[in-house]
């Protein structure tokens, strides 16, 4: 019986570049991305001992993985900036909009940086 493959080798290589590009995210948050072989790449989130990760999302498309990890990275950064303040009540969008324009630009430029590292062309 032939096993079904859910991700091409080309896309698997691209997903690995994306996962590697966001290495700093894994240090900031309880998130990791693993290569699950023929199934694609799996984002594991919110580790809670003794049961493990609460959320697992499988990706077979490098652009979708990139966008997911970008959102996680940005939201984590915004949370860390607003932690301990009333800004968090505004949600991530509100926190972002309350930042000075230069800080907003700095965060947005990081998306371009991640895309270059991951070789994702948007």
Model-predicted segments: where are they?
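Negatively charged, low-complexity tracts enriched in Asp/Glu with abundant Ser/Thr
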Residues: 2-29
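Acidic, low-complexity, intrinsically disordered interaction modules
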Residues: 35-114
